[in-house]
């Protein structure tokens, strides 16, 4: 039987969660370190309104730059994010059935929920969570969101994050991400993951580790902090959150360059967390009016 391509995995997950009742959203057009940073998660998990969504999110982690030479670690990758609020009682069964939709036979594979409570210091977010392993490889993260921006989430939302590359490696039986079948075609139409993304991976790795201008990034970080605070004051939490995301990415770039000391790092994390918090507070304030 032909193995699912990378894009087929995404389409099947979209269809599965759409059939459950989720709205399929689009990726957020900003540099984020994980699917959780999408405002559809950060802002919409707050408050008491139901929220059922799913989306793919390209994510960037400058510190994971490896010039495209590492078999499964990249500075740019993809996650599939699901938010179910309020969390249904049968969430574990729903997740396992999503794996079955990807032709994973649960009777022949060792699926384990390994306790791993989740925390994002820069978002002031945390929750009870589990890593989901399939035959010893982590393929997903499962979290009951308890707080975001330091604010308690009620009702509690369930977040499921599929690591698409890891899942595809397992499904296709491949050891290196760049060798993944992207589109399931043969001949001149066939595409591998590496043909789509790895030249960018090489170039952005050089930029992140060698050519990024630290003084410019420091200025941009400061500017984004000031803009975020200013926009919150004029009741614009969504543009303000964009500036928070920019500040977070600039911090990650500075960290990848190695120009931030351990002591300074804690200060930067706290600064970004404070920005996320004021955005969340203002969002809640306006949405309750």
Curated annotation (Swiss-Prot):
InterPro entries: aa-tRNA-synth_II/BPL/LPL (IPR045864), Gly-tRNA-synth_heterodimer (IPR006194), Gly-tRNA_ligase_asu (IPR002310). Keywords: Aminoacyl-tRNA synthetase, ATP-binding, Cytoplasm, Ligase, Nucleotide-binding, Protein biosynthesis. Its EC number is 6.1.1.14. It holds the Pfam family tRNA-synt_2e. One of its GO terms (cellular component) is cytosol. GO terms for biological process: glycyl-tRNA aminoacylation. SUPFAM superfamilies: Class II aaRS and biotin synthetases. One of its GO terms (molecular function) is ATP binding. It is found in: Cytoplasm. The keyword DNA-binding does not apply. It catalyses: tRNA(Gly) + glycine + ATP = glycyl-tRNA(Gly) + AMP + diphosphate. It comes from the Bacteria. Belongs to the class-II aminoacyl-tRNA synthetase family. Tetramer of two alpha and two beta subunits. This is Glycine--tRNA ligase alpha subunit. It comes from Rickettsia prowazekii (strain Madrid E).
């Amino acid at each position: 039987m032909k193995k699912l391509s990378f894009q087929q995995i995404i389409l099947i997950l979209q269809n599965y969660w759409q059939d459950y009742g989720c709205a399929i959203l689009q990726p957020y057009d900003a540099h984020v370190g994980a699917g959780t940073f999408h405002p559809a998660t950060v802002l919409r998990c707050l408050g008491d309104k139901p929220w059922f969504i799913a989306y793919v999110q390209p994510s960037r982690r400058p510190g994971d730059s490896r010039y495209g030479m590492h078999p499964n670690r990249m500075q740019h990758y993809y996650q599939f994010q699901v938010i179910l609020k309020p969390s249904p009682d049968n969430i574990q069964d729903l997740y396992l059935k999503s794996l079955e939709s990807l032709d994973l036979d649960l009777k022949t594979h060792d699926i384990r929920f390994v306790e791993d409570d989740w925390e994002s210091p820069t978002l002031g977010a945390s929750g009870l969570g589990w890593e989901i392993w399939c035959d010893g490889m982590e393929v997903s993260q499962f979290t009951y969101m308890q707080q975001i921006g330091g604010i308690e989430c009620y009702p509690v939302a369930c977040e499921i994050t599929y690591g698409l590359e890891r899942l595809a490696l397992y499904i296709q039986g491949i050891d290196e991400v760049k060798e993944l079948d992207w589109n399931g075609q043969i001949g001149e139409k066939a595409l591998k993951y590496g043909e789509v993304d790895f030249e960018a991976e090489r170039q952005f790795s050089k930029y992140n580790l060698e050519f990024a201008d630290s003084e410019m990034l420091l200025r941009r970080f400061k500017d984004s902090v000031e803009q975020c605070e200013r926009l919150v004051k004029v009741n614009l939490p969504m543009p303000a959150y964009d500036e928070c995301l920019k500040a977070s990415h600039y911090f990650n770039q500075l960290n990848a360059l190695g120009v931030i000391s351990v002591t300074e790092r804690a200060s930067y994390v706290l600064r970004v967390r404070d920005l996320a918090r004021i955005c969340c507070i203002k969002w809640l304030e306006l949405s309750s009016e």
